[in-house]
Amino acid sequence: MIRWDYPPLRSLADIEAIESIPLEQRITRWDFAQNLLDGCRLQPQRAAIHATHLGDIDGPVQTWTFADLERHAIQIANLLRARGIGADDAVAIIGPTVPAMFALLMGSLLAARPFPINWMLDAPALHDLIVQSGAKAVVALGPTPGFEVWEHVQHAVESLQGRVPVLTVHDPFGPAHPNDLLGAASEHPGDRLMFERPTAQRNSVACYVHSGGTTGHPKIVKILHGGLVFRQWAASLGLAFTPHDVVLSDTPLFHIGGLLVRGLVSTADGHTTIIPSMHGARDKTYIANYWRYVERFGITQISGVPTTLSVLAKNPPTTENIASLRPFFATGSTAMAPSIQDRIEEITGARTLQSYGLTENTSHATLDLRDGEIRPGCSGVRVPYVQVRIVRMSDKGDIERDCAVNEVGMVVLRGPGIAGGYLNDDHNQGVFLPDGSLVTGDLGSLDGDGYIRISGRKKDLIIRGGHNIEPRLIEDALLQCPAVALAAAVGKPDAHAGELPVAYVQLHPGASITEQTLLEFAAAHIPERPAVPKDIVFLDRLPLTAVGKPQKHLLQIDAAERVFRQVLQPLTSAWALKVETSGGGLLLTVSVKGGGPQAHRQVDSLLSAFAVRYKVDVS
């Protein structure tokens, strides 16, 4: 499976040359759990994991060898089976990245179906995902200062009346808790599986991962062994991985990118993984020490979503030796200003390879060519054996035609990374097509050389009087301003145009600029006049998912609240407004005290011109 004499990747011609050999001749076994065991056995005494405490580069380090990791994983697999958890049962995993989580993921892949869940969700959201998945066990971070995971998990499972057992993991630099996972697992053999485990097939479900981080409505995706094995192969090819690599795990394991490229793929390829902090890249101490981590541990590839890289670009290494870094690394998740890419290459010598992917494709479908041209604003070319189409779709969701070169349309993928669909079959309609294609919901275009440019989510289009405005057109322009660190554009409701563009920005620390100056900058850099934002809202911190994507549904709610609080000012009775997203759009609830039918009619007269759903509660 693992090879290190990688061919060059300079153009689509090199991709096509790789495809001259059928994938089935390159990959002959599709059992990803077995690949993990093989990775541990490459160099058993090599360090698999180094963990430090909350970004403290000078503090203690917990180290596991690959032999340690394999032993813990097999013990956990035996523990799960001994407690009646079967191959098709889900194990909900709720907590930040610690060494035990790697063993848990690996062990539950051997015995069951791991389901890493966003540990920052509140109790109702956790409960919903646990119930949806049918999890037969929960493993969560126990009581830990600075984290509310345990409290939320307790509330999430209390209505299950003990039907789902809960085990704990702990801060590796703190005490163990009751029902400690590793303690319970230590009572079981670690040198062999105590149950028969058939070899997983290409279409066998390996694990669950939830999507929906930018919408607030997660869907559970069935990730297949075939998709995981292909992702290992494709990532290793695209980034020329070797067992000598040392990588940082600072992206959450509940995100498909953190789970794979900075998680399980690293283990399967025999990399040493550094866990700098349980808070990951959100830990300011870790980010302040970033270049010291590179020096101390000999990091070979930078890790970082664009938001992290923008901070690192402003804080380059000073005396640190970063010669261990290889000449390229990958990032993704959201648009990044070309100036940040240029600055990172200037201070590190490493090129930033942009990628495009999604959970439903088991991570990336495209990646910049490590030996080829990088085109600003693009996310590389398709990886081998993956088909990327840009199509026009009818209002009914049918594919009408393929788009022309540089024409924007819906991105549709097909290939060995496509997931097995959503756990809830009702969500599959119009997304996972009968021919095996995936309708991504993203808009993009392909140039004549196969480079993809992602414009944004179709649902995020700003529709101004029939004019479709791509948010990225606004965001890319604002990111060219030296004062702007992050930007996100959404539509605000308008009685005449339907929507008008508004931008939310986060400035670099210490930067200053007025709204008027930034509006003028936007007008000068946005080629379409209707796309120039009407307002710019400055935020101390843009709301982001754990991997740096703007949570646009929150910004859409904020923009609507700002509009309708002004629109409803003429109401003569006391009133309150609630705005939420529902059914793919906005839903307003206006609560009025007193006034009877007259108050209801007054609300109708104020809101009827807007293309939003609303309800009126009169008390």
Segments (PLM) and residue ranges:
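Structural core segment of the AMP-binding/adenylate-forming
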Residues: M1-I2, A82, R113-G183, R613-V618
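Conserved AMP-binding/adenylate-forming
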Residues: P276, F329-S355, T359-I452, K458-L461, ...
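Conserved AMP-binding/adenylation subdomain of ANL enzymes
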Residues: V229-V246, F254-T300, L309, K314
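AMP-binding/adenylate-forming catalytic core of the ANL superfamily
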Residues: L121-V131, V138-L141, I302, G415, ...
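Conserved AMP-binding A3 loop
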Residues: T63-A67, A206-F230
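Conserved AMP-binding/adenylate-forming core of the ANL superfamily
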Residues: T28, Q45-V98, F102, D122-H127, ...
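Adenylate-forming
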Residues: A140-H152, P276-G280, Y290, F297-D342, ...
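Conserved pre-ATP/AMP-binding loop-to-beta segment of ANL
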Residues: P44-A47, F173-A176, S186-H210, H217, ...
